[in-house]
Amino acid sequence: MEQFTNTVPTGWTMNNDALAGQATGAGQVHSGLSAVQLASGAQMSQTHAAAPGSYYRLSFYAQGVGDQPAVTGRIIFTDAAGGESNAADVTVRSQDMVKTAPNFGYYQVISTVVPENVTTVTVYLEATGGADDSVILDDVSLTVV
C-alpha cells in the first residue's frame, strides 16, 4: 500500500480515518515503502465492478502489534437490487497472528463463483483486539482467478 490520502490508502474507504495510519518504519513493511496500520475497530473497504461467472482471491500480508490483535478479510457480493452476500471470509485470530517484526503472515481466501446478478465485489478488512492493539497490512490484493 504505497499511496495514501492523509491516513488512508488511496482508493480505500474507512469507517474512521483516525483508526488508520501509514506504516513506514523498519520491520513494518512487507514490500515497497509503506503499509497500512489499522487500530482495533478499524474497518477498511474497497468496491470493484464484478465479473459474473468468476472467482475472486483476496490475499494480504499481516503483522500484529500488541497483545490481542486480529483481522478479518471478507469478500462481499452486491446485486443490482442492493442485496449483499458474504462470498468468503478469512479470520486471523490473535493466537495465530505473526507479532514479531519484521515477519509477516500471508493469508488468502477464494470466493464462491460470482452469480450473474451481482454487479459489485467489495473487499472488507476489519482489525479487532484491545485498545492498544493494531494490525499492519501490506500487499492487499483482490484478483480474478
Label each region the model flagged.
Residues 59, 122-126:
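Extracellular recognition modules
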Residues 1-4, 40-75, 107-112, 140:
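Extra-cytoplasmic beta-strand recognition segments
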Residues 33-43, 98-101:
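Extracellular beta-rich ligand/substrate-recognition surface
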Residues 51-53, 79-82, 113-117, 144-145:
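A short, structured loop/turn motif at beta-sheet edges
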